[in-house]
A protein has these predicted regions:
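NAD(P)-dependent Rossmann-like dehydrogenase/reductase catalytic/cofactor-binding core
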Residues: 6-8, 12, 219-282
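Internal alpha-helical scaffold of NAD(P)-dependent oxidoreductase catalytic cores
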Residues: 117-127, 143-181, 194-231
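Small-residue helix-packing motif on alpha-helices
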Residues: 45, 55, 73, 210-217, ...
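NAD(P)+-binding Rossmann beta1-loop-alpha1 motif at the extreme N-terminus of oxidoreductases
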Residues: 7-75, 142, 205-206
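A short glycine-threonine-serine/GTX helix/turn-capping micro-motif
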Residues: 180-191, 240
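Rossmann-like NAD(P)(H) cofactor-binding subdomain of soluble oxidoreductases
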Residues: 52-53, 61-62, 70-146, 150
Length: 282
């Protein structure tokens, strides 16, 4: 079952206390989004990093409490966000499991790491939500998919939606096995989009356009096309047909794409990436 949520769905997190373990790229993006959208008071926000210098930098930049000790940081917090790499997850969970409680919500961004794995590592009935954002979150245009663990209640999901709604759109799924497909499609998807942008740009350059102009035309065209799909709700095939006139320029270009096997290549990319995600998942 899919619960469709958008970033305009919001409840107040003002009185909640939030700790972000790992203020790296995505962790800092979340922190920035939370602050800009006034979701949580600054005095109720905290972040941790492995290096003292980086902790001081974050403190100075955002005016929040920063730590290098995760155990100290999570005390009294309502929401704990694990914005760390999967190879670090076991060590971090082992460090905090003795002091974490079932009243705290854990949100994990660690790729290929199931809610069950986190629950087992913590050795308690802890509410855990798995989140898969993507890199456009860095400019608040992300796509995040959430999947709740077995101890999650509706209010936990609503809080997670608010947090990730600060950096883009949010969807919720309840079948965790689909997170491997999510990883392959929206998690890895920006890389596929970039190679398409790069290739179309090269095509424009080959035919005489200045490189920067070709890149801008390509990026804006794909951005606009994506927004049309989202805003109109129309099937991409219908939108494609609206651009394709009989005996026109577009149909010849489409024929070359079909001849090159673009559909099959993209479908196979998702299939292979999904299998890879399954291979490394735990």
């Amino acid at each position: 079952m899919f619960l469709i949520k958008r970033r305009d769905i919001n409840i107040m997190l003002t009185n909640k206390k939030v700790a972000i373990i790992g203020v790296g790229k995505i962790g800092e993006t979340l922190l920035n989004g939370i602050i800009k959208n006034n979701l949580v008071k600054k005095e109720n926000l905290a972040g941790s990093t492995a290096q003292e210098a980086h902790a001081q930098e974050i403190n100075k930049k955002y005016g929040i409490k920063t730590y290098i000790n995760n155990r100290e940081m999570i005390l009294g917090k309502d929401i704990i966000i694990l914005a760390i790499k999967p190879q670090m997850i076991k060590k971090v969970l082992s460090d905090i499991k003795e002091i974490i409680s079932g009243k705290q919500l854990v949100i994990s961004i660690a790729a290929a790491t199931s809610t069950q794995f986190i629950e087992e590592c913590l050795e308690k009935n802890i509410p855990v939500i798995r989140a898969m954002p993507n890199t456009p979150a860095l400019i608040n245009e992300g796509m995040t998919v959430l999947c709740p663990g077995k101890y999650i209640e509706e209010n936990h999901i609503r809080m997670a939606i608010d947090v990730f709604g600060a950096i883009g759109l949010v969807e919720v799924i309840h079948r965790e096995e689909l997170m491997d497909v999510v990883t392959a499609l929206s998690g890895s998807g920006p890389a596929y989009a970039y190679i398409i942008i790069e290739s179309l740009t090269e095509g424009g350059v080959r035919m005489g356009l200045p490189r920067e102009l070709a890149k801008k035309l390509t990026a804006q065209t794909l951005s606009g096309a994506s927004k049309m799909v989202l805003k109109t709700g129309m099937h991409p095939a219908l939108l494609k047909d609206a651009v394709t006139t009989p005996a026109g320029v577009t149909v010849d270009g489409l024929m070359e794409l079909e001849d090159g096997g673009i559909r099959v290549a993209l479908i196979k990319a998702i299939s292979r990436a999904t299998e890879k995600s399954k291979e490394i998942s735990r």
